[in-house]
Each structure stands twice: as C-alpha cells, then as structure tokens.
C-alpha cells in the first residue's frame, strides 16, 4: 500500500482533493482542510454511508469524523473534511502521509 483516502472503510476514494494547510505560529497546532469535488462516495453508482475520512498509508491510519457534504440544487456536489493536528509530531505524521499520497497520485506541493 502506498497511500489512500477512504470515506467508507475498504473503499478508496478515486477523486483527488484540494488540500489547504494552516499552522499556528508556534507550530503546536495545524489544520488540513480537504475539498473533494463530486467524490465517488457521493455520486457513484453505489452510495456508501460516510463514516469519516480515513487516511491510510504504510504507517497506519489517520482519521477524522469532521466531514460535511455540499449540495447544489438538492444534488450532492462535494465533501469537505477537516483534519486537526494538535502537536508537531501529528503535523509531521500528516506530512509523511501527504508525501506518499502526492507520489501515488502524481501531485505537487505549493506554498501560498
């Protein structure tokens, strides 16, 4: 396994999200906000129960239950998930996951 994101355990989400990172000045806290445009978890042929967002890689699993769906004209349009990091160690672990996920999906990293 390299790295994958799931909303239902066992089912990888193929849609690659837009990810925005913020970090406190002292480096103790951070937030990663993921936005998925028309994810398969919402618009696929078989809709699944979304139980959270699970970030899986060779080191294990990171998870958040803070997942919100966006609807436009009554139709599912996207998912937003927020992952909180409360220590420099959690930040480093998250960044290792993102490095693996970026490599697996041909993504790059840009600083704002």
From Swiss-Prot:
Pfam assignment, any one: Psb28
One GO term (biological process): photosynthesis
Gene3D superfamilies: Photosystem II Psb28
Membrane topology, as annotated: Peripheral membrane protein
Annotated localization: Cellular thylakoid membrane
Source organism, top-level taxon: Bacteria
Cleavable signal peptide: none
UniProt xrefs under InterPro entries: Psb28_c1_sf, PSII_Psb28_class-1
Swiss-Prot/TrEMBL keywords: Membrane, Photosynthesis, Photosystem II, Thylakoid
Assigned GO CC terms: photosystem II oxygen evolving complex; plasma membrane-derived thylakoid membrane
Assembly, per entry: Part of the photosystem II complex.
UniProt record similarity statement: Belongs to the Psb28 family.
Protein name, as recorded: Photosystem II reaction center Psb28 protein
Gene name as annotated: psb28
């Amino acid at each position: 396994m390299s790295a994958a994101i799931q909303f239902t355990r066992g089912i990888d989400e193929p849609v690659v999200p837009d990810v925005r990172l913020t970090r406190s000045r002292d480096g103790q806290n951070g937030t990663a906000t993921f936005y998925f445009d028309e994810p398969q978890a919402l618009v696929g042929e078989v809709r699944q129960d979304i139980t959270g967002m699970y970030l899986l890689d060779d080191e294990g699993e990171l998870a958040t239950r803070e997942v919100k769906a966006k609807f436009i004209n009554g139709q599912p349009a996207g998912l937003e998930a927020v992952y909180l990091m409360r220590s420099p160690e959690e930040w480093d672990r998250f960044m290792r996951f993102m490095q693996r996920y970026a490599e697996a999906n041909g993504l790059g990293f840009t600083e704002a």
